[in-house]
């Protein structure tokens, strides 16, 4: 059976996902077969495996760092909030049903067998399984029948390392307080703590570390510095939405929808020379930009209503009149059409809502979800404005409940030629007659370096700017970032001690 290690945190966003990613790469570098595992993930940022199954993006990133293909076994339960009160429950990569919190808590104990089966599947096929907890193990109102923190650690008999975020302030109190709220059996399972996101002189920190060890009777296994690494984040709890950039040569505005999903779609754009990204948050104006992107969302009708309530629809139409480029991805693509219908109330109580009217499509939210790894061809139907995109193949993935239908003489954006390794021929997306508005269901399209370069060069040419010769290969860039992350974390942690802890639990 594999070695096991579980990373838990004092709160959400303390760095659990990133540390698990780093450990996966470290163990890979050490010649071990390693797999990540998170029993239950709540996130709108998801990923589609090559079998067409949906998991949390964090586990896909961790698998990539481990050098293996993502699998539904790594994240058997995915919760995708669709409103303030309900979440879509995805089990082993497939939609189960929408549930309220109360309904899910009653249902949750039935999932233990499924969780154990998937963990054992990984443990039998790997040398190490690195487990990620969720939120905090000290949420005392949720501890009963826990399946994601200490309950999971006990189920699979894994040692726990507790992570605290010093950048937030109060790290000693958060670690000591967490330990206080654990029962004796749970405290005994915590084998050490990690201080994350440290800035400054570590010598000043050392006396505090010694005092903390005396208080909690656990060793500090390392202090990880604040890291500026470019690796996909798990969910929307991120600073990216509130970072304001100076004006660039090409300014791209992205609307931060209330239920934004797969926001990592736009990370490759941040690596394109001369491109500046700004997120338009609730209550803010779009302002001037060269490209406006409306991203994916878990609640298209609800988010479109919010967009209209804040008057952003008028700003979008104004940008259209100015000849700016407007791009929609998945739910954002649906919003650009004439109408969105939800006859089965999958996402909303509203059966129908008028769209922005910028593309000749009608969307119907269906009961069945399309999930696939996708390859598509950008054909001759594209207008001359986008002529440099003609003939390109792009890869990405689809996750959508809706189906969109071209109206009248409207034109599609691409032809899907492959889904989950099977040959198909399916029309995707839509494009306006002048090519300045287009939408697609394909997430990850900007990870295609040639597509991104050609599209940005179209904008640059219109502004009289020199075209880019090349843009960074984002997939190669990610690989280098995994190695850089692993080197920082390896040099910050007592890896010899961590190996000893894992070996000790192998025999328990």
UniProtKB/Swiss-Prot annotation:
What processes in GO biological process is this protein linked to? cobalamin biosynthetic process
Q: Which domain of life is it from?
A: Bacteria
Q: Which InterPro entries match?
A: Class_I_gatase-like, CobQ/CobB/MinD/ParA_Nub-bd_dom, CobQ_GATase1, CobQ_N, CobQ_synth, GATase_3, P-loop_NTPase
| One Pfam family this sequence matches | CbiA
User: Which Gene3D superfamilies did the record assign?
Assistant: 3.40.50.880, P-loop containing nucleotide triphosphate hydrolases (3.40.50.300)
Which molecular-function annotation in GO is an example for this chain?
catalytic activity
Which UniProt keywords are listed?
A: Cobalamin biosynthesis, Glutamine amidotransferase
**Is Protein biosynthesis one of the keywords?**
no
Q: Which residues form the active site?
A: 330 (nucleophile), 443
**Annotated coiled-coil segments of the chain:** none
- Which pathway, metabolic or otherwise, does it act in? Cofactor biosynthesis; adenosylcobalamin biosynthesis
List residues of the GATase cobBQ-type domain. 249-451
For this protein, the record's NCBIfam families field holds: cobQ, PRK00784.1
PANTHER family, sorted: COBYRIC ACID SYNTHASE (PTHR21343:SF1), DETHIOBIOTIN SYNTHETASE (PTHR21343)
Described purpose of this protein according to its UniProt entry: Catalyzes amidations at positions B, D, E, and G on adenosylcobyrinic A,C-diamide. NH(2) groups are provided by glutamine, and one molecule of ATP is hydrogenolyzed for each amidation.
Indicate the family of this protein.
Belongs to the CobB/CobQ family. CobQ subfamily.
Name under which the protein is recorded? Cobyric acid synthase
Q: Which organism is it from?
A: Caldanaerobacter subterraneus subsp. tengcongensis (strain DSM 15242 / JCM 11007 / NBRC 100824 / MB4) (Thermoanaerobacter tengcongensis)
């Amino acid at each position: 059976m594999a070695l096991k290690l579980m990373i838990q945190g004092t709160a959400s966003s303390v760095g659990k996902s990133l540390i698990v990613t780093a450990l996966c790469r470290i163990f890979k570098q050490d010649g071990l077969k390693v797999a990540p595992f998170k029993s239950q993930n709540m996130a709108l940022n998801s990923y589609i495996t090559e079998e067409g199954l949906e998991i949390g993006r964090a586990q896909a990133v961790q698998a990539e760092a481990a050098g293996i293909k993502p699998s539904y076994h790594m994240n058997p339960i995915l919760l995708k909030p669709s409103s303030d009160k309900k979440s879509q429950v995805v089990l082993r990569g497939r939609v189960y049903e929408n549930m309220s919190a109360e309904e899910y808590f009653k249902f949750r104990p039935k999932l233990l067998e499924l969780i154990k089966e998937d963990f054992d599947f990984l443990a039998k096929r790997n040398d190490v399984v690195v487990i990620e907890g969720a939120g905090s193990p000290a949420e005392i109102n949720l501890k009963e029948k826990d399946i994601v923190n200490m309950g999971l650690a006990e189920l699979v008999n894994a040692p726990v390392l507790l992570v605290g975020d010093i950048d937030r302030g109060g790290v000693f109190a958060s670690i000591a307080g967490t330990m206080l709220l654990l029962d004796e059996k749970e405290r005994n399972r915590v084998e050490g703590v990690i201080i994350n996101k440290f800035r400054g002189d570590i010598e000043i920190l050392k006396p505090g570390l010694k005092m903390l060890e005396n208080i909690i009777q656990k060793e500090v296994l390392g202090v990880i510095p604040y890291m500026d690494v470019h690796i996909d984040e798990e969910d929307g709890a991120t600073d990216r939405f509130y970072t304001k950039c100076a004006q660039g040569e090409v300014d791209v505005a992205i609307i931060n929808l209330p239920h934004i999903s797969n926001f990592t779609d736009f990370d490759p754009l941040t690596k394109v020379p001369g491109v500046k990204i700004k997120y338009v948050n609730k209550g803010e104006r779009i302002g001037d930009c060269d490209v406006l992107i409306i991203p994916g969302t878990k609640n298209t009708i609800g988010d479109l209503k919010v967009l209209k309530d804040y008057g952003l629809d008028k700003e979008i139409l104004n940008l259209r009149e100015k000849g700016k480029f407007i791009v929609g991805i998945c739910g954002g693509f649906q919003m650009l059409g004439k109408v969105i219908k939800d006859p089965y109330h999958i996402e909303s109580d509203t059966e129908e809502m008028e769209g922005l009217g910028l593309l000749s499509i009608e969307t119907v939210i269906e009961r069945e979800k399309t999930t696939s790894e996708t390859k598509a061809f950008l054909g001759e139907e594209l207008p001359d404005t986008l002529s440099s995109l003609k003939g390109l193949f792009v890869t990405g993935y689809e996750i959508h409940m809706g189906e969109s239908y071209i109206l009248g003489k409207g034109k599609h954006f691409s032809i899907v030629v492959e889904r989950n390794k099977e040959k198909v021929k399916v029309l995707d997306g839509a494009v306006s007659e002048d090519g300045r508005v287009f939408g697609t269901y394909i997430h990850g399209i900007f990870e295609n370096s040639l597509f991104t370069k050609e599209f940005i060069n179209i904008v640059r040419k219109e502004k009289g700017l020199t075209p880019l010769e090349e843009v960074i290969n984002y997939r190669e860039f990610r690989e280098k970032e995994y190695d850089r992350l692993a080197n920082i974390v390896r040099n910050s942690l007592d890896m010899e001690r961590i190996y000893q802890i894992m070996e000790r639990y192998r025999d328990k």
